[in-house]
């Protein structure tokens, strides 16, 4: 039945989008689906054998609480780390301040901070005489704050909390949560102490702190320097005719504190978390009871994570014994916890829990790029150069050492590559087993993320972290060796321009243009939680045509439903000579159906009756879009193909509506794209590989959430 449905759907797409003059050279009926089925119903029972023991066993009214042993740290994480009924509001992690430039008493430091708060309040409350603007006031305030950060850094967080509230940036509780001792106040002391507040850093910082204070800076292009010029006639990569399967997972956001039966439709972020009953004994009203397998406003519970993993084999035709050639994970393992609820141990435990399950179900190496939530505080990564690899520059090395050691432990990386990752922000370059003609280069994209305040330092230098120098070195070595390259990162550099710093995205675009299409075959991202594709062109996208299209950025759909999305993942069929994508299959599960599943599991959760979630083939990229662009059946799904898709959208708006449907993984809650303005914006996003290009598009249509 599932195969028949997919064939009918593919034929319908062909009829709807066929070119009016030329017959398609591609026939959807020729699609060979990768798995034994196109629809798979996951067993309701939780597969308890995936973990050796449990603090709390899985059941119809609770998520499991597995005992997680860390093979690298040689520790067992305690139950109270993830106990859903006792979520912590603080941690014992090191609090790192910049070294003060003078030796002053605590009382003097407190007085300096108090005086600074008064002065900054005066600056903002003064009138605009003399041509002062809100932005210039903010820059002046930063100079005062910098004095506190340099002289009395330990008093800096309390000052930020006070100003955040008094200037009405947010509520006091939110200000305390963000900038207090258990938030990011110490990190902001580091940033202000090191920033060029009177220059570009200051403008970025003010824009970061409040979007209405300073206009967001536009791109200031810095010319990238390469070891060698681009070859005038580079050798064209040859296809082998042999294809392998590659799995692409992204943004699981496992929530080990997910509480079944809690409020799933809450008004505060995030839902499906336990809340204490009122002291008067009344039963709180719950509008939507958190289902066992997850909900639209919640991150992934264990039940959903394991359900998705169980579906991969039947749907893709792979298994632990017959694995994909390799798999990609484009970041974000950790749930969207508030800053005071996270800790280093919480991050480490989640990393182990997820990769243990991946190891059990997927097999083969899994190449991971860290996401902005794969650290604590979330979004924060400091460049080593902030203090020449000293205390501040190495403050996140605990995580780089941990993940790289785990990757070596699971035999996903050779020890030499794991060592490279431990000293390069968890970024590395590796060739998969049996495929020396391909090099995979992963990046830590937090270092160019708009919401990482450390990335705002030395803003005029797009490679302050050295991440792009690392990328150029590896790409040049690949070019010299005749290798193909896949770049794997979390944060997309383009689309609507809302994620990557403008200068960094521009610099990355220059690198892509220099080494494409003869070296870089594909780029893979995550982060948006949505199914998207972006095209990079020659000459910084000034001429967006089929002839100028160079390479595609594939954005993988998320496993988490957050927010208002279905759960999904993708599998590619790839030629082992050119490492071009020849086919892409995307799979999903309807999260809206989960409210009917909770009661079907027995009391122990290890031998349940009934059915769990249904995962199914959502679409074949070739069958869906190929007829619309008359794409030959043996041609790769490359940048030229995707540019053709955007041209087809210009001719037929219905294709943009279909793309938007798939963007949210066919979620009933996703926004639709039914206007000409939306269609034009969507096409513009797809043709925008940098922040500057994306910002030129009509805003407001980038996300379906």
Predicted regions and their residues:
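Fungal secretory targeting signals
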Residues: 1-22
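Metal-dependent phosphoesterase/phosphodiesterase active-site architecture
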Residues: 19-190, 196-207, 213-318, 326-329, ...
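Active-site neighborhood of phospho(di)ester-bond hydrolases with catalytic His/Asp-centered motifs
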Residues: 248-250, 325-332, 365-372, 486-490, ...
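Active-site environment of divalent metal-dependent phosphoester hydrolases
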Residues: 256, 335-338, 368-379, 449-450, ...
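Core catalytic region of metal-dependent phosphoesterases/phosphodiesterases
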Residues: 297-392
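Acidic, His- and aromatic-enriched active-site or binding-groove loops in soluble protein domains
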Residues: 349-361, 389-413, 509, 513, ...
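Short, surface-exposed basic-aromatic patches at helix termini and helix-loop junctions that form
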Residues: 358-360, 503-517, 536-549, 573-574
């Amino acid at each position: 039945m599932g195969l028949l449905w997919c064939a009918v759907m593919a034929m319908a797409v062909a009829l709807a989008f066929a070119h009016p003059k030329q017959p398609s050279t591609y026939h959807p009926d020729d699609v060979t689906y990768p798995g034994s089925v196109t629809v798979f119903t996951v067993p309701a029972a939780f597969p308890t054998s995936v973990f050796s023991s449990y603090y709390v066993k899985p059941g119809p009214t609770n998520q499991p609480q597995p005992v997680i042993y860390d093979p690298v740290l040689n520790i067992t994480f305690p139950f109270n780390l993830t106990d859903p009924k006792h979520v912590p509001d603080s941690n014992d992690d090191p609090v790192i301040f910049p070294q003060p430039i003078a030796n002053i008493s605590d009382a003097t430091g407190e007085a300096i901070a108090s005086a600074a708060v008064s002065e900054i309040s005066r600056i903002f409350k003064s009138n605009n005489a003399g041509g002062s603007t809100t932005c210039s006031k903010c820059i002046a305030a930063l100079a005062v704050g910098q004095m506190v950060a340099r002289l009395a850094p330990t008093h800096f967080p309390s000052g930020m909390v006070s100003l955040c509230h008094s200037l009405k940036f947010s509520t006091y509780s939110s200000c305390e949560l963000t900038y207090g001792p258990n938030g990011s106040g110490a990190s902001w002391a580091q940033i202000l102490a090191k920033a060029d507040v009177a220059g570009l850093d200051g403008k970025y910082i003010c824009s970061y702190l409040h979007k209405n204070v300073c206009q967001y800076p536009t791109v200031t292009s810095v010319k990238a320097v390469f070891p060698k010029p681009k070859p005038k006639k580079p050798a064209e990569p040859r296809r082998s005719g042999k294809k392998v399967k590659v799995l692409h997972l992204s943004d699981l956001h496992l929530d080990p504190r997910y509480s079944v039966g809690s409020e799933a439709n809450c008004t505060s972020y995030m839902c499906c978390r336990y809340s204490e009953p009122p002291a008067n004994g009344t039963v709180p009203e719950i509008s939507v009871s958190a289902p066992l397998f997850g909900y639209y406003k919640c991150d992934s519970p264990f039940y959903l994570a394991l359900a998705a993993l169980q579906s991969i084999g039947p749907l893709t035709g792979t298994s632990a014994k017959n694995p994909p050639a390799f798999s990609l994970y484009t970041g974000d393992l950790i749930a969207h916890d508030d800053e005071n609820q996270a800790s280093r141990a919480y991050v480490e435990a989640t990393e182990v829990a997820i990769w243990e399950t991946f190891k059990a179900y997927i097999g083969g190496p899994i190449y991971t790029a860290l996401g902005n939530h794969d650290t604590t505080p979330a979004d924060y990564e400091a460049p080593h150069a902030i203090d020449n690899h000293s205390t501040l520059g190495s403050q996140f090395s605990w995580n780089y050492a941990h993940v790289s050691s785990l990757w070596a432990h699971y035999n996903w990386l050779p020890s030499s590559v794991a060592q490279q990752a431990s000293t390069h922000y968890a970024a590395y370059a590796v060739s998969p087993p049996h495929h020396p003609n391909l090099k995979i280069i992963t990046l830590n994209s937090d270092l160019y993320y708009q919401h990482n305040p450390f990335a705002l330092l030395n803003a005029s230098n797009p490679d302050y972290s050295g991440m792009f120098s690392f990328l150029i070195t590896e790409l040049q070595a690949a070019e010299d060796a005749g290798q193909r390259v896949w770049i794997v990162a979390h944060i997309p550099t383009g689309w609507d321009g809302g994620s990557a710093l403008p200068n960094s995205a521009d610099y990355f675009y220059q690198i892509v243009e220099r080494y494409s299409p003869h070296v870089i075959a594909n780029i893979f991202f995550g982060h948006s939680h949505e199914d998207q594709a972006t095209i990079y062109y020659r000459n910084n996208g000034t001429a967006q045509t089929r002839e100028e299209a160079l390479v595609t950025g594939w954005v993988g759909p998320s496993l988490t439903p957050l927010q208002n999305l279905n759960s999904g993942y993708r599998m590619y069929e790839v030629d082992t000579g050119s490492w071009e994508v020849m086919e892409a299959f995307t799979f999903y599960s309807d999260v809206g159906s989960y409210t009917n599943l909770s009661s079907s599991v027995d009391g122990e959760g290890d031998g349940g009756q009934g059915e769990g979630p249904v995962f199914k083939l959502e679409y074949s990229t070739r069958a869906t879009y190929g007829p619309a662009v008359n794409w030959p059946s043996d041609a790769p799904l490359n940048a030229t193909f995707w540019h053709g898709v955007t041209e087809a959208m210009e001719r037929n708006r219905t294709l943009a509506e279909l793309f938007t449907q798939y963007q949210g993984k066919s979620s009933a809650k996703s926004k639709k794209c039914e206007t000409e303005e939306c269609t034009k914006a969507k096409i513009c996003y797809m043709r925008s590989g940098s922040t500057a290009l994306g910002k030129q598009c009509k805003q407001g249509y980038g996300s379906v959430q």
